[in-house]
Amino acid sequence: GFPIPDPYGWDPSFRTFYSIIDDEHKTLFNGIFHLAIDDNADNLGELRRCTGKHFLNQEVLMQASQYQFYDEHKKAHEEFIRALDNWKGDVKWAKSWLVNHIKTIDFKYKGKI
């Protein structure tokens, strides 16, 4: 996979060039960062809320543009939500998932939605 930024945070290498998606990705990085600092129910709940909102927004854009990899992308989102819902405090896994999801899966829709 891709290297995990240290310090952990969004940087221009994660830019999809869709401002709403990039802004939401920044929020997700912040959510995972806060969870890494303090693994508590409030931080987990906030990350879950922001993640659900972001995935819904992204999926609506994909459906509207008939993005060909929509099903694969939605499945990746569902797997992450399941993992959050079954959270065991694995912050390292969450950091890695977001970095690799954006750079591998999200970048496929650059210029297509």
Swiss-Prot record:
What the protein does comes down to: Hemerythrin is a respiratory protein in blood cells of certain marine worms. The oxygen-binding site in each chain contains two iron atoms.
Name it: Hemerythrin
Residues bound to Fe cation 2: Q58, H73, H77, H101, D106
Assembly behavior: Homooctamer.
Please report the organism this UniProt entry assigns to the protein: Themiste hennahi (Peanut worm)
Any one Pfam family here would be: Hemerythrin
**Gene3D superfamilies attached to this UniProt entry:** Hemerythrin-like
The similarity annotation says: Belongs to the hemerythrin family.
What disulfide bonds does the UniProt entry report for this chain?
none
UniProt GO MF annotations: iron ion binding; oxygen carrier activity
Chain positions recorded as Fe cation 1 binding sites:
H25, H54, Q58, D106
Query: What are the protein's UniProt keywords?
Result: Iron, Metal-binding, Oxygen transport, Transport
This protein's superkingdom?
Answer: Eukaryota
